[in-house]
């Protein structure tokens, strides 16, 4: 009992905080929002990589998000609503995750000492997740704001124009690695935390986690290259404004 009190005093914990159930509820909410964002990330990567199939395939995916199954021409505002929802979930998740970040130098030193002494792989993964999560909050917010305010620009020509001519390639290369590492580590830690797939060993889960990271990073880099290539073709074809790029995408609808 005395040892427990010493540890609690070292970390600044109190008996009142220990008895509160609010922290368990916040922890569950953090896990739930993280799971939603991770699943969205996976779906998003598969959908944007449709440009690897063809420009028309990517255009159809974009129109699908605009409700083309129900509205013949699609409605870009639907994309704005989805983007707003993702932004809300991202902010809530980030706010909840900040509870576990070292908030002062003393806590950082405690974590650093713990990380050095334990030399545990999962502790290092948490540190990577914390860094990528911090970067994602800013990088993803910029991307989501563009999707929120310019949903009509999503398409093979419009998106690639943003990549090359508007220089978003610099943002997206950092966002790619941050999202894929953060998401795969997050899913791995969720599986362990909540006891899913109990018949799979920790070593097996780690292999799945790294396989997932490699797969999505490679897929992301191939997709990244495809948008760069298309963006350079836009320049060669004389597309000088976003409006011209949007009009070029419109030809797929007419077809």
Give a label for each model feature.
Residues 1-255:
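Membrane-embedded alpha-helical bundles that constitute the cytochrome b-like, heme-associated redox core
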């Amino acid at each position: 009992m005395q040892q427990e009190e010493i540890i609690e005093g070292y970390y600044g914990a109190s008996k009142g905080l220990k008895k509160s159930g609010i922290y368990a509820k916040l922890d569950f909410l953090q896990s739930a929002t993280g799971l939603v964002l991770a699943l969205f990330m996976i779906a998003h990567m598969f959908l944007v990589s449709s440009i690897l199939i063809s420009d028309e395939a990517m255009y159809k995916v974009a129109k699908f998000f605009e409700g083309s199954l129900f509205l013949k021409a699609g409605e870009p505002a639907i994309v704005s609503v989805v983007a707003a929802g993702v932004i809300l979930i991202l902010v809530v998740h980030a706010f909840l995750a900040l509870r576990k970040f070292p908030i002062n130098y003393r806590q950082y030193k405690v974590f650093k000492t713990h990380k050095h002494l334990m030399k545990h792989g999962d502790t290092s993964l948490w540190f990577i997740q914390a860094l990528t999560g911090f970067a994602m909050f800013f990088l993803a917010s910029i991307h989501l704001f563009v999707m929120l305010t310019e949903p009509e620009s999503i398409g093979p020509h419009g998106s690639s124009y943003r990549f090359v001519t508007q220089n978003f390639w610099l943002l997206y290369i950092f966002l790619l690695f941050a999202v894929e590492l953060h998401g795969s580590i997050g899913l791995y830690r969720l599986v362990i935390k909540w006891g899913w797939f109990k018949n799979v060993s920790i070593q097996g889960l780690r292999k799945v986690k790294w396989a997932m990271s490699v797969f999505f990073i490679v897929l992301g880099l191939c997709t990244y290259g495809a948008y760069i290539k298309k963006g350079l073709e836009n320049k060669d074809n004389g597309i000088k404004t976003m409006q011209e790029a949007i009009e070029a995408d419109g030809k797929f609808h007419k077809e």
